[in-house]
């Protein structure tokens, strides 16, 4: 349906002092704090996790050397979505508007809508990250699970066994937990946290935990071990599209974790209808958000 003069009555008459409602600031590309972006030339992308070798055994004198097998563990798949939105203006609405260029105003609103949608979709991977039934990964588990299966029969956990709110103890335990992660054959992988990702409600807690020299909540003169050790070297980032006010997450240095594939970059176009004189504008892009290795992220839903 085209935007006509009926929707723009005040803009057809003199005496209007201001038009407002589309000048709000918008949050930036917050997904870049979480995801690695790659381009894609297919309708979907797949990434397969490989299993290497176990620890080497002792070879006895004169005995045969032991041989091990490598294999594929599982495959993660990214299905790109097409995101598109448009609007149409009648010829008369454009002609009779007394105040500004309608197309310029509403193309800005279109860009705002497309940007907002991308940030919501990016954050929803974390928002739904504890739901393995509806949002499983390549290993058939939720992004955050206590039992990511390994080829050797063991498991890795990238969440808490008992959910806890963000505090000094829970954050220190998360750092310790990462140090115990192994590969598919049980070899330690030296994983470390990089950045704390939080909703707006936890920004002041995060500042006290990561940016003070001394421990918080105590009269003792103890140092802030998280800060002194550089345990979370990139500090924290607020994501305004997280829906759980007490959930918090850590990005890690494990490669091939959280990924954003860009199939088609954002494009805009317009055309005119000869019969009606209406002008149509649209924006369109194709992308996907997801994860390959779940160890690229650690998360807690909070208590």
Q: Over which residues does each language-model region extend?
A:
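Long, contiguous amphipathic alpha-helices that act as assembly "spine/axial" helices in icosahedral shell
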Residues: 76-132, 196, 281-283
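Solvent-exposed alpha-helices and their adjacent loops that cap or buttress functional pockets
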Residues: 79, 188-190
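Short low-complexity stretches enriched in small and charged residues
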Residues: 2-4, 37-46, 64-67, 89, ...
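N-terminal alpha-helical "arm" segments
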Residues: 1-27
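Assembly/oligomerization interface modules of large self-assembling protein complexes
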Residues: 22-83
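Internal, conserved structured core segments that host functional sites
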Residues: 125-147
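Sequence/fold signature of self-assembling virion shell proteins
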Residues: 2-10, 141-183, 190-195, 201-303
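A generic local secondary-structure boundary/capping motif
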Residues: 75, 184-186
């Amino acid at each position: 349906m085209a935007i006509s003069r009926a929707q723009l009555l005040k803009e057809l008459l003199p005496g209007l002092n201001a038009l407002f409602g589309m000048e709000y600031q918008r949050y930036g590309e917050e997904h870049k704090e979480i995801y690695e972006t790659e381009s894609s030339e297919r309708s979907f992308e797949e990434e397969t996790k490989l299993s290497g070798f176990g620890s080497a055994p002792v070879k006895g004198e004169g005995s045969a050397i032991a041989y091990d097998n490598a294999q594929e563990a599982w495959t993660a798949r990214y299905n790109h979505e097409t995101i598109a939105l448009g609007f149409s203006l009648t010829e008369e609405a454009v002609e009779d508007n007394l105040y500004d260029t309608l197309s310029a105003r509403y193309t800005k609103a279109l860009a705002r809508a497309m940007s907002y949608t991308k940030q919501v979709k990016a954050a929803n991977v974390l928002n739904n990250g504890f739901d393995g039934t509806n949002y499983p990964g390549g290993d058939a588990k939720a992004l955050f699970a206590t039992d990511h299966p390994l080829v050797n029969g063991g498991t890795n956990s990238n969440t808490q066994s008992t959910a806890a709110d963000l505090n000094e103890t829970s954050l220190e335990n998360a750092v310790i937990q990462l140090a115990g992660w192994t590969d598919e054959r049980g070899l330690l992988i030296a994983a470390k946290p990089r950045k704390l990702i939080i909703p707006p409600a936890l920004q002041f807690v995060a500042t006290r935990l990561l940016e003070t020299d001394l421990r918080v909540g105590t009269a003792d003169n103890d140092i802030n071990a998280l800060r002194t050790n550089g345990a979370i070297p990139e500090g924290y980032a607020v994501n305004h599209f997280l829906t759980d006010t007490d959930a918090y997450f850590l990005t890690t240095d494990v490669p091939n974790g959280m990924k954003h594939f860009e199939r088609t970059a954002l494009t805009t176009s317009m055309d005119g209808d000869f019969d009606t004189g209406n002008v149509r504008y649209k924006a369109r892009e194709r992308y996907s958000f997801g994860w390959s290795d779940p160890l690229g992220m650690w998360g807690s839903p909070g208590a």
